[in-house]
């Protein structure tokens, strides 16, 4: 495989003469903010243990399936968790793509989705329904330091090594590398795209900045669900992965790291003949749904491939047309030393 350091795509087309000083100004702001939080200013502690799942860079690290994994672990340990998130990309009065995905994946788990997560959680805990909730999972919580946490998990996309990256807007980093010193646990994601030598090298490089344990995780497809548009809605059919080999597909995405998504598709033998890419969290339009539907009226036309994060938004569009097929991978995360994560979670819940 190629060196993962070479896989970091350019985050911006703006010339370095513009982005370099902007990144420098950004670093001044983030360093000032972190110094205040390090001193405990503006940090509140809840009367429940808090587990944060976050990252060092902009989107695409795999936070959502990791949140689901943590929530299920907590449930297996007998806890009743609540997910707290900002609700990025959601219109007023509507649910965002990540909230909808959470609701499908971990049905019944309460979700606080608002910019002021602290106020939302306090309001929930003061209610009758919130009394039994005993642990908080912060989705994208590494930079949301207003809430003290008992376990700070930081995800790093192995295909975007942070020591080969730069601060926003010149690069993808939301914080400098030294911020990894706050992490209690670092998890390298998307390692299925690296060989063992590359993984070992990256673990060593990350460990220079992170005194915490560094685990590795693979994103896997357990199968795919094919949704077919019918007169009164969508029908769903679970299809085994081996049936997808050599299948031609169109792809559409509005996610943080679409290249990782496309790479996984190709690893499973799918032939991506076209990719329609939008910005992270962007909404799909009725005209786009109509165009994709019209394209599938042709003989032997390929189905559309989408992540579940995109599908929860797109399925509500009304212009698809009958007979349209959309393929959605069932994504999960495998952690190499998963017992270490389980012990960390259990320890936090017992001691908090």
Regions found by a protein language model. Name each.
Residues 70, 74-75, 102, 206, ...:
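Hydrophobic alpha-helical packing residues
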């Amino acid at each position: 495989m190629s060196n993962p350091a070479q896989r970091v795509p350019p985050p911006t087309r703006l010339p370095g003469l513009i982005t370099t000083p902007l990144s420098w100004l950004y670093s001044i702001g983030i360093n000032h903010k972190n110094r205040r939080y390090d001193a405990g200013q503006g940090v509140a502690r809840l009367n429940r243990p808090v587990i944060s799942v976050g990252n060092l860079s902009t989107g695409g690290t795999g936070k959502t399936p990791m949140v689901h994994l943590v929530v299920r672990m907590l449930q297996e340990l007998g806890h009743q968790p609540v997910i707290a998130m900002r609700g990025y990309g959601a219109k007023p009065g509507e649910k965002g793509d990540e909230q909808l995905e959470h609701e499908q994946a971990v049905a019944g788990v309460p979700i606080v989705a608002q910019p002021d997560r602290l106020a939302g959680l306090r309001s929930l805990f003061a209610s009758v329904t919130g009394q039994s909730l005993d642990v908080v999972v912060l989705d994208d919580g590494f930079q949301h330091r207003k809430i003290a946490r008992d376990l700070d998990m930081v995800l790093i996309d192995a295909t975007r090594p942070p020591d080969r990256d730069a601060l926003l807007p010149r690069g993808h980093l939301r914080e400098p590398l030294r911020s990894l010193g706050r992490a209690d646990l670092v998890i390298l994601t998307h390692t299925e795209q690296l060989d063992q030598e590359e993984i070992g090298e990256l673990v060593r490089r990350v460990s220079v900045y992170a005194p915490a344990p560094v685990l590795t995780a693979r994103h896997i497809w357990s199968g795919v669900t094919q949704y077919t548009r019918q007169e009164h809605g969508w029908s769903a059919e679970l299809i085994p992965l081996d049936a997808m080999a050599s299948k031609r597909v169109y792809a559409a995405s509005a996610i943080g790291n679409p290249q990782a998504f496309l790479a996984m598709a190709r690893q499973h033998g799918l032939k991506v003949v076209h990719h329609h890419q939008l910005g992270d969290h962007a909404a799909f339009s009725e005209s786009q749904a109509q165009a994709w539907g019209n394209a599938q009226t042709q003989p032997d036309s390929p189905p559309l491939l989408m992540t579940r994060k995109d599908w929860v938004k797109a399925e509500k569009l009304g212009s698809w047309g009958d007979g349209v097929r959309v393929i959605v991978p069932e994504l999960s995360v495998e952690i190499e030393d998963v017992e270490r994560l389980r012990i960390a979670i259990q320890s936090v819940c017992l001691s908090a």
